[in-house]
């Protein structure tokens, strides 16, 4: 009689960012991947002519792997495994593979049983299963991340010329544009996406001590044993390993680092949205969700909050993977390997949720251009004080310039009252949109175009197109007075 399944501890009650997005890393999918890894080993033996082909066909049939087109969620080949019994039995050996092998052998014909798990060690199967899980999950992560990046890039181009205040150390610094800020989000996401695309998902097959000795005996030759890991990887839908990685854990740490970078990039987006959406700033707002239980007037940045919750947790999880890798002693690790499993799964889980929420956030984000321009004028023209310094210090000296900025009253009127600035177009020099530098060019992806001799010319062309050279550096002596330092 089947045992009672284990009580579900975590359905997302305390992890709303992952709710509805973590099926691909659930225990069911991990179990599915474990079974697929065991079946892939039998298939690899058959591909090399070591095991009869009919054995591989029969094993695939028993566990449903010959049914094409069915999603793992609907057609888990592990559906006949007593999960409760498996979980309970996993404690004794420290991993689920040991009891799983016995359960799988019970389901196949007697002549197939010797080929289940033959020559492999538990780590071969579990590492391979985690790579299967990771590859599936990362396809979804990549899809959602790409959408978020594309939407951020669209925002950048749409608002390339819309002026805003750049803030450094929380304070207004110089003018920028809304688009330049969105381009920063897009570049971070695109860099993370490139890292995801570069990932490898190698299978693991090296035997008990990483020497493949058992496979030499089983296959009858060093050549067959050397070819077996690649055949195993093909059958599992993974990359061929270049060598055993039982204790060289780069596939795990590189995957973890890519996930942390993804969540870093999304965390930056979410942090900016949460800050810029404050009532007193109001430059952006989320287009979905965000109600308050006690204050109906509030529109909480719920998407940004959820994304930030994931981003704040990710670095510590990534650090755990590196710590485990550094403590992967001998030829098989004791405990460090085990620490990776839930850590990697949680990173994948957070990335699945955060990327989906980021795609929604970027797709529905509303920009209040008027609020951004209004905020840029809050300091009464002092947002362009960097520019003013280059213009006025040669005329009135640094002490008087400092007094001018520190004084009360309308800055434009104070400038017009200066005899030394009689020929100055005050409105033009105080216009923040006339001192955005290359922000529109950056927003339109100028910095991301192909490198080469044409980049400077393109920058100059874009600057001229947007009127950025109307009051150029030479006219006001900005470089001479160190404004660009």
Task: Briefly describe each language-model feature range.
Residues 1-212, 224-231, 292, 304-306, ...:
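A helix-coil-helix interface module used to build multimeric assemblies
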Residues 47-51, 110, 158-161, 241-242, ...:
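Intrinsically disordered or highly flexible coil/loop and linker segments, enriched in small
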Residues 127-135, 141-142, 150, 157, ...:
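Charged, flexible cofactor/metal-binding loops and thiol motifs
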Residues 163-166, 240-243, 380:
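Long, low-complexity hydrophobic alpha-helices enriched in A/L/V/I and glycine
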Residues 312-322, 333-413:
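C-terminal catalytic subdomain
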Residues 465-483:
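Long, intrinsically disordered low-complexity tandem-repeat segments
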């Amino acid at each position: 009689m089947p045992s009672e399944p284990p009580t579900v501890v975590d359905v997302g009650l305390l992890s709303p960012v992952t709710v509805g997005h973590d099926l691909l890393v659930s225990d069911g999918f991990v179990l599915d991947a474990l079974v697929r890894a065991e079946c892939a080993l039998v298939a690899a033996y058959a591909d090399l002519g070591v095991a009869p082909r009919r054995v591989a066909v029969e094993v695939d049939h028993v566990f449903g792997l010959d049914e094409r087109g069915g999603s793992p969620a609907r057609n888990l080949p592990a559906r006949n495994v007593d999960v409760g019994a498996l979980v309970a039995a996993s404690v004794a050996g420290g991993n689920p593979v040991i009891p799983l092998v016995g359960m799988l052998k019970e389901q196949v014909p007697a002549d197939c049983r010797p080929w289940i798990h033959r020559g492999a060690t538990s780590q071969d199967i579990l590492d391979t299963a985690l790579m299967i899980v990771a590859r599936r999950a990362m396809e979804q992560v990549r899809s959602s991340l790409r959408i978020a990046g594309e939407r951020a890039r669209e925002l950048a181009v749409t608002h390339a010329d819309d002026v805003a205040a750049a803030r450094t150390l929380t304070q207004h610094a110089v003018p920028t544009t809304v688009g330049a800020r969105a381009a920063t989000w897009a570049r971070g996401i695109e860099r993370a996406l490139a890292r995801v695309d570069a990932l490898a998902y190698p299978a693991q097959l090296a035997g008990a001590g990483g020497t493949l000795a058992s496979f030499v005996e089983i296959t009858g030759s060093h050549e067959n044993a050397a070819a077996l890991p690649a055949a195993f990887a093909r059958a599992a839908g993974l990359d061929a390993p270049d060598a055993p990685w039982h204790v060289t854990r780069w596939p795990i740490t590189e995957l973890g680092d890519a996930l942390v970078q993804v969540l870093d990039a999304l965390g930056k987006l979410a942090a900016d949205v949460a800050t810029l959406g404050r009532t007193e700033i109001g430059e952006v707002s989320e287009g979905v969700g965000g109600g308050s239980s006690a204050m109906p007037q509030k529109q909480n940045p719920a998407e940004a909050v959820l994304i930030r919750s994931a981003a704040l947790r990710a670095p510590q999880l990534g650090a755990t993977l590196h710590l485990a890798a550094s403590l992967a002693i001998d030829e098989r690790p004791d405990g460090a390997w085990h620490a990776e499993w839930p850590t990697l799964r949680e990173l994948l889980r957070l990335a699945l949720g955060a990327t989906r929420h980021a795609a929604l956030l970027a797709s529905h984000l509303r920009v209040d251009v008027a609020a951004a321009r209004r905020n840029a004028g809050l300091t009464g023209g002092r947002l362009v004080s960097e520019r003013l310094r280059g213009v006025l210090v040669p005329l009135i000296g640094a002490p008087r310039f400092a007094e001018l900025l520190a004084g009360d009253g309308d800055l434009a009127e104070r400038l017009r009252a200066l005899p030394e600035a009689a020929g100055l177009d005050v409105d033009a020099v105080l216009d923040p949109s006339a001192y955005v530098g290359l922000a529109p060019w950056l927003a339109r992806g100028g910095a991301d175009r192909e490198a080469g001799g044409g980049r400077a010319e393109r920058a100059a062309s874009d600057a001229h197109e947007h009127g950025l050279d109307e009051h150029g550096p030479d006219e006001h002596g900005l470089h001479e007075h160190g404004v660009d330092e």
